[in-house]
């Protein structure tokens, strides 16, 4: 199984679990991305819970939406085992074409330091990446404890793969899984197609 994205038994079980989760969600869940989902929760009363999506701390800040959202750890299996998420996000880099490298390096050092992350960066609406900001009492007070409540999920996550070809696979396999969740393909067909895409 060296050229498969996942073994058959594990893959079929994962697809079955996704299907079970989606069957308990409102019908619009397959049309929304996480931001649209948080907008729905923060802006109305038709949905009260999202069990599994990437977090955006601005929805946990007073005044951002009609409803202040509270974030927590990921859902658990019936046996109590926690699910794990991928850790991705935006980064900060310096282009090889940069003509002011030293200034760019100093800016990156400044914006990524703990003090900036827990003050200016957060105050400006940013979602900090520095652990000290996630543990900061004032940052958590002003974000309805978003960071403290989700830190364990971050600690238990796995880093999104960065190898050449992975993003193409992710972009291509997503619609395949989506079709399965809309009952347009069997789990077996879905797994075969995902493995085909993984070999490309």
Describe each PLM feature range:
Residues 43-53:
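Alpha-to-beta junction loops
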Residues 24-31, 49-50, 68-70, 118-121:
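Acidic/polar loop patches that form or flank catalytic/metal-binding clefts of enzymes
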Residues 62-124, 175-178, 182:
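Extracytoplasmic/periplasmic substrate-recognition and gating elements
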């Amino acid at each position: 199984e060296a050229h498969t994205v996942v073994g058959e038994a594990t893959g079929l079980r994962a697809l079955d679990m996704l299907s079970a989760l989606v069957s308990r969600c409102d019908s619009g869940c397959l049309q929304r991305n996480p931001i649209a989902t948080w907008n729905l929760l923060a802006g109305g009363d038709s949905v009260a819970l999202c069990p599994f999506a990437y977090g955006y701390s601005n929805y946990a800040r007073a005044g951002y939406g009609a409803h202040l959202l509270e974030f927590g750890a990921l859902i658990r299996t019936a046996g109590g085992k926690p699910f794990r998420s991928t850790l991705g996000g935006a980064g900060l880099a310096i282009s090889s074409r940069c003509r002011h490298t030293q200034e760019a390096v100093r800016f990156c050092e400044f914006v990524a330091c703990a003090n900036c992350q827990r003050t200016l960066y957060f105050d400006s609406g940013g979602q900090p990446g520095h652990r000290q900001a996630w543990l900061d009492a004032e940052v958590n007070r002003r974000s309805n404890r978003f960071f403290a409540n989700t830190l364990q999920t971050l600690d238990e996550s796995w880093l999104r793969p960065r190898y050449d070809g992975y993003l193409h696979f992710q972009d291509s396999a997503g619609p395949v899984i989506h079709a399965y969740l809309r009952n347009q393909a069997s789990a077996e067909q879905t797994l075969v197609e995902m493995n085909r895409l993984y070999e490309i």
